[in-house]
Amino acid sequence: MESGKTASPKSMPKDAQMMAQILKDMGITEYEPRVINQMLEFAFRYVTTILDDAKIYSSHAKKATVDADDVRLAIQCRADQSFTSPPPRDFLLDIARQRNQTPLPLIKPYSGPRLPPDRYCLTAPNYRLKSLQKKASTSAGRITVPRLSVGSVTSRPSTPTLGTPTPQTMSVSTKVGTPMSLTGQRFTVQMPTSQSPAVKASIPATSAVQNVLINPSLIGSKNILITTNMMSSQNTANESSNALKRKREDDDDDDDDDDDYDNL
């Protein structure tokens, strides 16, 4: 810091000498030389602004010249805008005391970066994982129909002919207690066939249980109609007995013819 007395008063301009005198009157004795220039620039800018505002107020009041009242009004308006004093110390202490009464958030027990609560952070993931749904393979095997109650069985045998087996059509009407979704599934129904005790050992017997494949597209929500073609052992027995009877009748006729021939 250099003293203001180092520069000779005679070499300084009149405005600089006046500013140095103002600083001396305020008790400022040590300052840099450029402080005088900054203060002069500030004073020039401030005075110019005040006079411009005073001229505007005078023209608004329809006055011919700028008087002292206009200058006072301009200084008052500029002081309210530019020069604001800081708040009192007591006021600042009261605000600080109220702020310090708020407790700080608890420190997390685990180690790591000291971050605020999760709702204030942007570290949460903004996406969701979609679970892969495994589609059940319908062609893996056959499914047995559970809880099928057979209501009525009707048999309608057709008229048999010699030499050719006649298939028998059976319609089974069943009811399902609860509607089931059987789309795209195949299942097996086991049905016992009726066997007649008159079947001889020479006649090939059919299987006791036959498997019937049901197409799910033909199944309704309540009733199931099963139609199958199977060989009737009873019809086969009837055919064989009829053939034996006819053979015996033919033999009897031949014997009668022989007796008549002998009598002649």
Swiss-Prot record:
Residues 120-137 bind DNA. It comes from the Eukaryota. Residues 149-176, 232-264 are annotated as: Disordered. Its main location: nucleus. Residues 151-176, 232-243 have a biased composition (Polar residues). The modification Phosphothreonine is found at T159, T161, T164, T178. GO terms for cellular component: MLL1 complex; nucleoplasm; nucleus; pre-snoRNP complex; SAGA complex; transcription factor TFIID complex; transcription factor TFTC complex. The modification N6-acetyllysine is found at K5. The modification Phosphoserine is found at S149, S152, S155, S158, S181, S196. It is found in: Nucleus. Residues 250-264 have a biased composition (Acidic residues). Keywords: Acetylation, DNA-binding, Nucleus, Phosphoprotein, Transcription, Transcription regulation. One of its GO terms (molecular function) is p53 binding. Induction: 6 to 8-fold by apoptotic signals. One of its GO terms (biological process) is positive regulation of response to cytokine stimulus. Coiled coil: none annotated. SUPFAM superfamilies: Histone-fold. Component of the TFIID basal transcription factor complex, composed of TATA-box-binding protein TBP, and a number of TBP-associated factors (TAFs), including TAF1, TAF2, TAF3, TAF4, TAF5, TAF6, TAF7, TAF8, TAF9, TAF10, TAF11, TAF12 and TAF13. Component of the TATA-binding protein-free TAF complex (TFTC), the PCAF histone acetylase complex and the STAGA transcription coactivator-HAT complex. The PCAF complex consists at least of TADA2L/ADA2, SUPT3H/SPT3, TADA3L/ADA3, TAF5L/PAF65-beta, TAF6L/PAF65-alpha, TAF10/TAFII30, TAF12/TAFII20, TAF9/TAFII31 and TRRAP. The TFIID basal transcription factor complex plays a major role in the initiation of RNA polymerase II (Pol II)-dependent transcription. TFIID recognizes and binds promoters with or without a TATA box via its subunit TBP, a TATA-box-binding protein, and promotes assembly of the pre-initiation complex (PIC). The TFIID complex consists of TBP and TBP-associated factors (TAFs), including TAF1, TAF2, TAF3, TAF4, TAF5, TAF6, TAF7, TAF8, TAF9, TAF10, TAF11, TAF12 and TAF13. This is Transcription initiation factor TFIID subunit 9. It comes from Homo sapiens (Human).
